[in-house]
Amino acid sequence: KVSQLEDDLTTSEAKNTKAASRSGGLAKQLADAEHKLGLATKNIKSLEGALSDAKSAAEDESKGKHDNHQKLQNALSEIEALTEQLDEEQASRQDLQNKFSRANADAQQWKNKYDTDGASRVEELEDAKRKLANRVQEMEEALAAAESKAASMEKVKNRMNEEVEDLLLDLEKAQAQASNLEKKQKKVDQQINEWKLKCDEIQADLDKAQRDARGYSTELLKVRTASEDTIEKYDALKKENRALSAELQSVTEQLSDGGKNSAEVEKLRRKLGMENEELQIALEEAEAALEQEEGKLLKVQLEYTQLRQSSDRKLSEKDEELEGLRKNHQRQMESLQNTIDSESRSKAEQQKLRKKYDADMMELESQLESSNRVAAESQKQMKKLQAQIKELQSMIDDESRGRDDMRDSASRSERRANDLAVQLDEARVALEQAERARKLAENEKSENSDRVAELQALYNNVANAKAEGDYHSLQEEIEDLENEAKASEDKAQRAMAEVARLMSELNSAQEATSTAEKSRQLVSKQVADLQSRLEDAEAQGGKGLKNQLRKLEQRIMELESDVDTEARKGADAIKAARKSEKKVKELAFTIEDEHKRREPAQDTADKLNQKLKKMRMQLEEAEQQKSTWQSKYKKAAVELEDAEERCEAAEAALQKARQRARGASGSATRGASRAPSQPRTPRSKTARAGED
């Protein structure tokens, strides 16, 4: 049995070493998880930097919008200047009409004068009429050009006014969208603050529950230790009771063997009976205390389970609240995604219109190749507008490059967020593995504790059996000595048996705690009395009996040393089991702390993902606004090119009119050369020329 007990102890020590190695592995896994969490915090800081960069880029974009607004104001001022120029053109047109009316009056005067002066001044009149016709034709051409130019300028003015109105409407829409986005941002910030407060409350409740659980666990350990002490005291008292009952039986046997010293034996029996009653009372008190401690232990366990259930219930409720908030936020994100899709469809339609406008521009460029010159004033204005368009195009290109940079930064931040999510998943998996390992370690710890308890019980049983076997062997030796000795040595043999029993009682009293010290002192006094009696009996007996008693005492000392070594081994095994239990509990607390640290990191990662999505949406809206501005600027450029083409067409019409006027003047000169031979025909021709 002792060898089996030693084997069990070795197996328990091996299991304890395995548990220690597993706890070391779990500690390594926790260290890896801490390292991963450190990397996650670094990545979160980098994401925060990227978010700050994106915010700065958004501020730059708002500055660009402000600059575009200023440019719009400048374009409006230029439109006002063009309107003033149009008014001047209308005034010049009025002057030309006045000159034309004056020329008609002069022609009428010349006609009247020609009618009065007669044929003598036909040639002069013809020359004056030709000059006047040329002048009238030039005036008409200039007037037509001015009218066409005024009409084109009026159309340009109307178009520019319409564009300005469209731009103002778009600006108002953009401002309304910006205000809506700011309101949404404020609402989201309020929700985030509310979530933070709720998370802080949940964390405070969880910390409080864990502190209470730790306090209850410490009280539970104290109650367990107290119960173990009471159990040990109870076992010690049982051993003492057994020893006293054995002593009482031996005394009764002595009384049955002989009637000598009956008075002393009767006193001793009464004394032992009183001591037995006292020990029985102490045993009952110990049992009552043990029952009280067990009741306290059950009460503490019930309170601990109730507290654990309440904390789990609160955590589940908080998790449900967070899940509901997360679903609401997901719905908002889906609605925003739908709006983004509609805006992307409108953007595709704008791309189609842009392609159509590009085709129209190609056709207009083919028409521009056939034109020759542009009027000076319109050319200057066109150059100014082209310079402005180039500046706007360069600004748009800069904004597009900034947009590409922002898109790249957003993509980088998204990749970082994905990497963070992967790392968080890995950390979560590692924590789950650590949790499973912790549970396995706890199961092994409970199995080891049960095994140690069983081994302790086996050890106690084996020790008791060994002590009883040694006791029986000693009794057999004493009986052999009784058979060899004479009747005069009976008292000495009984005293030796009493010494052996009292020595076994002393060994059991050494294993008990300080509460059993009083009973051991009483037993030691009894041993002293019996030793004095034994010395008296030895004085009466022979020297051979003394040698045998010495041998028996040496054997008793050896047995005591063996029992002490076995007790030390058992105590060491119990200490090792308690140390492993403490290590497992510390590991469980560290895993719970890591779980607490991981939850705020997950929350911050989710918040950063939400902020990234918002920034991405804002970037897409800014891109759409830029595309609308760019399309409007291109439309203005197309309209300006149309105006330029109309100016060129007017100039070509002017040249054609001049050519027709030159042809008409040539025919008039040929009619004048035929005038002397036929005096009346020239008049009719000149009249027709005037009508023409």
From Swiss-Prot:
Highest taxon above the source species: Eukaryota
GO molecular function, one term: actin binding
Keyword Coiled coil (UniProt): yes
Coiled coil: 25-670
Residue spans of biased composition, Polar residues class: 11-20, 506-524
Compartments, record wording: Cytoplasm, Myofibril
Acidic residues: compositionally biased ranges: 1-10
Chief location bin: cytoplasm
Region (Disordered): 1-27, 48-71, 307-422, 506-529, 644-692
GO cellular component, one term: bicellular tight junction
Pfam assignment, any one: Myosin_tail_1
Key words of the record: Actin-binding, ATP-binding, Coiled coil, Cytoplasm, Motor protein, Muscle protein, Myosin, Nucleotide-binding, Thick filament
Biased amino acid composition, Basic and acidic residues: 56-70, 342-359, 398-418
Residue ranges, compositional bias (Low complexity): 662-675
Record SUPFAM superfamilies: Myosin rod fragments (SSF90257), Tropomyosin (SSF57997)
Region (Rodlike tail): 1-692
Protein function: Myosin is a protein that binds to F-actin and has ATPase activity that is activated by F-actin.
Stored PANTHER family: CINGULIN-LIKE PROTEIN 1-RELATED, MYOSIN-6-LIKE
Protein name: Myosin heavy chain
Species whose genome carries this gene: Podocoryna carnea
Lineage: Eukaryota, Metazoa, Cnidaria, Hydrozoa, Hydroidolina
